[in-house]
Swiss-Prot record:
One of its GO terms (cellular component) is Ndc80 complex. This is Probable kinetochore protein spc24. Residues 42-129 form a coiled coil. PANTHER family: KINETOCHORE PROTEIN SPC24 (PTHR22142:SF2), PTHR22142. Acts as a component of the essential kinetochore-associated NDC80 complex, which is required for chromosome segregation and spindle checkpoint activity. Component of the NDC80 complex, which consists of ndc80, nuf2, spc24 and spc25. InterPro entries: Ndc80_Spc24 (IPR013252), Spc24_Fungi_globular_sf (IPR038066).
Amino acid sequence: MLLDENPGTLIHHTIGNFNIQPDKQAVTRINDSLSTLQQSRELRMREAESSLRKLSRHLHSLNAQHEEAVAAHDSSKHAADMVELDTKKFRIAKAATELEIESERLESELEMLKERLADLEAQGLEGDEATRRERELDDATILRLKIYRSLGVDIEADDAGNFNKAVIRNSRKGDVHVVNIDPKFSRFFYSNYFWSTMQG
């Protein structure tokens, strides 16, 4: 046979190079983040509603005390109660404003996460078109390099990633030939040269 390894085995190894696990994990993390964010938002809203109810009850109690103070015609106590009521009202208004701002921020963050999730779902587990093309190109290159290596040819790349050197081993003779690949010669020329060197 021309190949040292069974083609089916080579193809099986090539399939193993496809890795969609990071994309699946990213989708899972986003879903978990959305769920956690929703739970956190609901908890904050419940806490805020509980706090507002407590403050409302307290305000009602203070209003009752204020009415009693007015009925008793105690002007000094009345003035003090009014100051306290104004302070409580200010705190309640401030707390309500902060809760509203936080709610808007959480809603905005939730929308961003939903958009991100929609983008990932639209791309699918294989990623977007550019990612798929790059992976397919890399997989084809890896397959070719494995085939060359099985034939006794190691292709070496320079710092720029260009394959410009081939090391050809003739196992029958124990020879090793190093060939610098020049773009001015055709692929057909190098194919014939490699083949004759391996068979020579």
